[in-house]
Swiss-Prot record:
Pathway: tRNA modification; tRNA-queuosine biosynthesis. GO terms for cellular component: cytoplasm. This is S-adenosylmethionine:tRNA ribosyltransferase-isomerase. It comes from the Bacteria. It is an enzyme of class 2 (transferase).
């Protein structure tokens, strides 16, 4: 299966670089996986597609202001993007500089604070800060907007590049399907008799990395930390018992649940995952999906194609471009029901 099979033309004007005035103001493209039928709706119309007894699973990770600017004590500006918080004072980070800092180098952070480079792990640097990491990031860090947004972060991004239900700090990218939900919509969903559960997957910067191989099967995913608690397992079992559907809000929720059910049986799980879901991979847990529109040739588009079927997904994306939907993190959304017999690119006549 070729990465190029997942390419499509996207006008630059359709890339959403700012959020809408209201979280729920987005459009919603509904894709019925079994038939491929499309419906053009508004995001609050999601309520029309939910049923009493359904279970919605959200990712409650909280985006940290993970981008820092500073300079080496010896001179030379640099940029730090925290990838993972290891403990109260240590992180793994990407460092962009004209010359990479050496072990033992001291980094002076703009706004106050400093860190020492204590080790290098392949492309990541282990940094030890002189003060606690999370308060430092809150004080002087910048929100790590995706590269395609192509602008400096603004004060409003601290609120809008964050879900209203974010709890556990650690992500360096937002689980963007959740950005469409405000408290009023969540209350209406609950009033309809739809249950909710929360997993945690700390989204890493690797989510924006392009696939650099020609064949999908040769790609290796970056690792991200996740937790699916026993309470989620119990909620899903109860949902199944009452005939409800498991609806994942975002691809990170899908990857969390399917990682915890890799052997076909859902179990509580806490640890790293590198699960790569592409056409041909089965789904053991998720019945429906709320998701944003993803980049061409991205692993997330491959996941959606595995869920809805390749021809159905690519036809939906072509329709989204034709109808002027807004793409990527601050863009519009889809609601997709799983295709029980999805076809891949190789199945096309």
């Amino acid at each position: 299966m070729r990465v190029a099979d997942f390419s499509f033309e996207l006008p630059d004007s359709l890339i959403a670089r700012h959020p809408l005035a209201e979280r729920h103001g987005s459009r919603l493209l509904v894709l019925d996986g079994p038939t491929g039928a499309l419906a053009h709706r508004q995001f609050p119309d999601l309520l029309d597609y939910l049923r009493p007894g359904d279970l919605m699973v959200f990712n409650n990770t909280r985006v940290i202001p993970a981008r820092l600017f500073g300079q080496k004590a010896s001179g030379g500006k640099l940029e730090v993007l925290v990838e993972r918080v290891l403990d109260s004072h240590r992180v793994l980070a990407h460092v962009r500089a004209s010359k990479a800092p050496k072990v033992g180098a001291v980094i002076l952070i703009d706004g106050g604070g400093e860190a020492e480079m204590v080790a290098r792990h392949d492309t990541l640097f282990e940094l030890r800060f002189t003060e606690e990491v999370l308060p430092l990031l809150d004080r002087v860090g910048h929100m790590p907007l995706p590269p395609y947004i192509d602008r400096p972060d603004e004060g409003a991004d601290r609120e809008r590049y964050q879900t209203v239900y974010a709890q556990r700090a650690g992500a360096v990218a937002a689980p963007t399907a959740g950005l469409h939900f405000d408290e009023a919509l969540l209350e209406k969903i609950a009033d309809k008799g739809v249950e909710r559960a929360f997993v945690t997957l700390h989204v890493g910067a690797g989510t924006f990395q392009p696939v650099r191989v020609d064949k999908i099967e040769d790609h290796h995913m970056h690792k991200e930390w996740l937790e699916v608690g026993q309470d989620v397992v119990d909620a899903i079992e109860a949902c199944r018992a009452r005939g409800g559907r498991v609806i994942a809000v975002g691809t990170t929720s899908v990857r969390s649940l399917e990682s915890a059910a890799r052997d076909g049986v859902l179990k509580a799980f806490s640890g790293d995952t590198d699960i790569f879901i592409y056409p041909g991979r089965p789904f053991h847990v998720v019945d429906a999906l709320v998701t944003n529109f993803h980049l061409p040739e991205s692993t997330l588009l491959m996941l959606v194609s595995a869920f809805a079927g390749y021809p159905e997904t690519m036809a939906a994306y072509a329709a989204a471009v034709e109808h002027g939907y807004r793409f990527f993190s601050y863009g519009d959304a889809m609601f997709i029901t799983r295709n029980p017999a999805p076809r891949g690119p190789e199945d096309q006549a």
